Design a protein with these regions (language model features):
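C-terminal His-loop and adjacent cap/lid subdomain of alpha/beta-hydrolase
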Residues: 1-191
Length: 191
């Protein structure tokens, strides 16, 4: 790890700033972005071994602290259960369409209240990706789907219908009186 740390932080006469300089996005001032009607969807795999999802949650919470209830008009965060860095994970439901969601938000003004995620281990589950990562969702039943809910909401089974079908789940906000809310229940709630 020390060698990796040294390499990532390296500089020289040509490259006077390290790559880390650009990785630490801490400014929550998105005023210029929002002034141009910018919209952003953050998503992060809960099993990401490279970057902690807690850093992304922290950034989003800081953004929400700065912009208050206005945050949801331009930014949404979705945590993806079981997903590694950008995709994959044997328990991942990593087949979803954030591009379609952002296009709909920008062009039609429809903010994503949820996105449907599927087990991409089943090649027919995602027509946009006919050759899925062979390990993605391999430990899950074929065809499983769930709604991805905007943070801090989480998907809760309605109690009727198949627990493998996203249609039988609803996005709910954590109860603020619940001592596990919002982070732990939001992040680790599983059906």
């Amino acid at each position: 790890m020390d060698d990796l740390n040294e390499a990532v932080n390296a500089t020289n006469s040509t490259f006077t700033q390290s790559a880390v300089t650009y990785m630490e996005a801490t400014s929550t001032n998105l005023d210029t972005f929002t002034a141009h009607n910018g919209k952003i969807i953050f998503f992060h795999g809960e099993s990401d071994p490279v970057f902690s999802m807690y850093d992304t949650v922290s950034y989003y919470e800081n953004l929400s602290s700065r912009d208050g209830s206005n945050t949801g008009t331009f930014a949404r965060l979705f945590l993806i259960p079981g997903m590694n860095h950008c995709s994959g994970g044997s328990y991942a439901l990593d087949s979803f369409d954030p591009l379609g969601a952002i296009v709909s938000w920008v062009e039609a003004g429809t903010a994503p209240d949820s996105m449907i995620a599927r087990n991409s281990f089943n090649p027919t589950a995602n027509p946009l990706n006919p050759t899925p990562n062979p390990l993605s969702g391999s430990a899950l039943p074929s065809g499983r789907s769930r709604p991805l809910c905007p943070y801090p909401q989480y998907a809760q089974y309605t109690g009727t219908g198949s627990s493998e079908d996203a249609a039988n789940f609803t996005c709910v906000a954590p109860n603020p009186d619940d001592e596990l809310a919002p982070k732990v229940k939001t992040i680790f709630h599983r059906q």
